[in-house]
Amino acid sequence: MAKPIPRIGSRRNGRIGSRKSARRIPKGVIHVQASFNNTIVTVTDVRGRVVSWSSAGTCGFRGTRRGTPFAAQTAAGNAIRTVVDQGMQRAEVMIKGPGLGRDAALRAIRRSGILLSFVRDVTPMPHNGCRPPKKRRV
């Protein structure tokens, strides 16, 4: 009779095996993507490899609360806490999107103690490209 295949690393039993070893990262890039529905904060090293990330959804906010400034502030704090422990001192900030969480996330990043070399808005703007969707009638 065939032996049952053991389940390794399912969602229920959490992380099996060890995490990647924490590297010392003195400088990095913080990407903030703020949409109307959610805010995603990703911290990468200078080469673009993801070190840490967080979003309003992973912080426990659900539904319309994910788009709030407080949710963005919490997500930014969560993402940055881990990289500060890994020794990040300087960072560049790239902010994308029109959401409410833009300023709140930036305020949380400033409060974390990381020295910001610059803050850049990288929201994609069309040079009159695709036709936008029709306006909502509520």
UniProtKB/Swiss-Prot annotation:
Stretches for region Disordered: 1-23
Protein localization: Plastid, Chloroplast
Single GO cellular component term: ribonucleoprotein complex
Keywords of the record: Chloroplast, Plastid, Ribonucleoprotein, Ribosomal protein, RNA-binding, rRNA-binding
Biological process according to GO: translation
Biased composition (Basic residues): 9-23
A Pfam family: Ribosomal_S11
UniProt GO molecular function: rRNA binding; structural constituent of ribosome
Name of the featured protein: Small ribosomal subunit protein uS11c
Organism from which the protein derives: Vitis vinifera (Grape)
